[in-house]
């Protein structure tokens, strides 16, 4: 039920606020015995959610239902969720799949900013070499569980094993 709510029936600000932070039992005790602390914490979470929304340039969508977002906007929202918990290592599996070029550029910009300004590290699985080339250096190209190539994207695009594996022989 929570996944359904976070995924589609909440506005993006509220969706970000649902991301669990500290999971200690302390929060339950505070909710029962110190309601003013809970109100203060909720205010801080709301403020952080708005910072994340602004950082990702989604302020024009802050009240939009998450379920109404495009695929690329949902992927930006997913990045926002990692920001809510201050994840410093983020694994991205084909983050660019199904995303239009404009939003892919926005997604790349957000990833770059998170890396440079906030110290996030990304491990990405991606097939779009142009997208990866903008974000990663070096790259590792794998096929069927084996490393085919390790080096720059430009060199990967010229490597015979990479070309054969991904483009086939004409």
Stretch-by-stretch model annotation:
Residues 132-134:
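A short, surface-exposed alpha-helical micro-motif characterized by mixed small hydrophobic
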Residues 105-118:
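Helical segment within the ABC ATPase nucleotide-binding domain
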Residues 65-69:
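Conserved ABC ATPase signature
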Residues 1-7, 12:
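Single conserved hydrophobic/aromatic residue that forms the stacking wall/gate
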Residues 17, 24-61, 109-112:
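Conserved ABC ATPase "signature" region
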Residues 90-93:
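Catalytic Walker B motif of ABC-type/P-loop ATPase nucleotide-binding domains
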């Amino acid at each position: 039920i929570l996944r359904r709510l976070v995924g589609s029936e909440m506005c993006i600000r509220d969706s970000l606020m649902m991301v669990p932070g500290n999971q200690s039992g302390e929060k339950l005790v505070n909710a029962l015995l110190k309601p003013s602390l809970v109100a203060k914490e909720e205010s801080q979470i709301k403020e952080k959610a708005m910072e994340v929304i602004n950082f990702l340039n989604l302020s024009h969508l802050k009240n939009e239902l998450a379920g109404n977002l495009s695929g690329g906007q949902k992927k930006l929202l997913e990045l926002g969720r990692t920001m809510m918990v201050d994840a410093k290592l983020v694994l991205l599996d084909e983050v660019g799949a199904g995303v239009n070029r404009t939003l892919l550029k926005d997604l790349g910009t957000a990833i770059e900013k998170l890396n440079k300004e906030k110290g996030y590290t990304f491990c990405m699985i991606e097939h779009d070499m142009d997208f990866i080339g903008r974000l990663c250096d070096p790259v590792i190209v794998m096929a069927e569980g084996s490393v085919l190539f390790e080096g720059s994207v430009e060199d990967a695009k010229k490597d015979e094993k990479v070309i054969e594996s991904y483009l086939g022989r004409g």
